[in-house]
Amino acid sequence: MSLARPNARLLSRTNRVFSSQIRTYSAPGDGVIPPAKKKYVPTSGTYPRGFKVGSAHVGVKASNTRFDDLALITSDTPCAAAAVFTKNKFQAAPVTVSRDLLKERGGQGIRAVIVNSGCANAVTGKGGIEDAKSMAKHTDACFTDSPDSPDSPYRSIVMSTGVIGQRLPIDKITSKIPTAFANLGDTHDHWLGTARAICTTDTFPKLMSKTFKLPSSDREYRIAGMTKGAGMIHPNMATLLGIICTDVPVAYFPLRRILASAANKSFNSISIDGDTSTNDTVAILANGAAGGDLIDTKFHSDFESLKQVITDFSIDLAKLVVRDGEGATKFVTIRVTNARSITDARRIASSIARSPLVKTALYGKDANWGRILCATGYSTARNPAVPEETSVSFVPTDGSEELKLLVNGEPEQVDEARAAKILEAEDLEIKVSVSNTPGKDTWFWTCDFSHEYVTINGDYRT
């Protein structure tokens, strides 16, 4: 039996389609920001008092021969600090070391965060733990003030990101920590350069800053944050790497409560590919340099206002990660309404957000709402969607009327031309109402899957 000969014209056309979608993988922090992403990179900022940041080139990853891959964030004075970490069972060495030092210190007296990109220091055994401790120890040594005692816990939080299962070139890293310290500064360029140094497959540095006031006074406070992540993003307590700094005077216990709440509504509400990293960490440092009354309990008059500020700020930071999803062409908001509980709503939204079939349909601009319904139906919600009461819509971002796809379990006659127009946009919303009984709503943010995602991750270790 003979095989059919391939259609040369079809093969040629297919190759052109694939080659037009794939970009060459480049070294972390190479500065080549896609034109469409430049609008997300700030050209200026107002940064919290008493913090300085800097970076240095180590060459952790062999392909990175000249771009900074070691980042240092410091405070002139000791900070209250809190963090949320991954729940992946294979937790990276820096996660273990940082969690332990925060616990031993009671979230007090933290001076710095040290971050390397290019190697995750995950699944590296006892040697990896010692390497993470060495990073903390060498960072602590840069400060001239004496620690509480020779046996005091480390004062520097450690983060790593990159390839799993490989040991750090620890001597190279520790030899460059003094260089990063010497490069410290408080200008916008310092902050932007440091945000770039924590990148891996990111196409742009993710940095934000803002000023705000609290009800108790007219004093101006400041907050700044940087984050990294473009792949292996799916929430489980925290996700990716994030560092937030503020000059508000706030004690550890209320700060920890605020971060836990903020992370749940932001970093825990995004998904790029459904993978939860071994290294996920989001930390917040508060040095009180702006002065004012110390927020020492959750009953303080400024507590709720500060929680809202940090939550909104965290949501905006988390959205930047989704906008830089590996190979992504769309930013998608998933809104689930009328669920029996917030947990149910989040599980349904998460199920839709991580569905490869939903994400590839969005990339192909295909209004295949059946895939959305399928993901809704197999979610792990304790109280699932009511099939005969479920409705699905596309909501355009231009303010025009939503396009109903399914109403009370009955398919609508879809205007395919309008659906295609909505799906052409960079931003869109998928709205899923899971019953007709008023209930709980939630938001989740995700992106599409393109050919480029496969290319980047097939080539990640090189």
From Swiss-Prot:
Q: InterPro entries from the xrefs?
A: Arg_biosynth_ArgJ, ArgJ-like_dom_sf, ArgJ_beta_C
Which reaction(s) does its UniProt entry say it catalyses?
Answer: N(2)-acetyl-L-ornithine + L-glutamate = N-acetyl-L-glutamate + L-ornithine; L-glutamate + acetyl-CoA = N-acetyl-L-glutamate + CoA + H(+)
Molecular function terms in GO for this entry?
glutamate N-acetyltransferase activity; L-glutamate N-acetyltransferase activity
Recorded GO CC terms: mitochondrial matrix
Key words, A-Z? Acyltransferase, Amino-acid biosynthesis, Arginine biosynthesis, Autocatalytic cleavage, Mitochondrion, Multifunctional enzyme, Transferase
- Reported EC number(s) for this entry are 2.3.1.35, 2.3.1.1
Where does this protein hold substrate? Answer: T200, K228, T239, E326, N457, T462
Task: Please tell me what else the database record remarks about this protein.
Answer: This protein may be expected to contain an N-terminal transit peptide but none has been predicted.
What job does the chain carry out? Catalyzes two activities which are involved in the cyclic version of arginine biosynthesis: the synthesis of acetylglutamate from glutamate and acetyl-CoA, and of ornithine by transacetylation between acetylornithine and glutamate.
What assembly does the database describe for this protein? Heterodimer of an alpha and a beta chain.
So what family is this one in? Belongs to the ArgJ family.
The protein in question is named: Arginine biosynthesis bifunctional protein ArgJ, mitochondrial
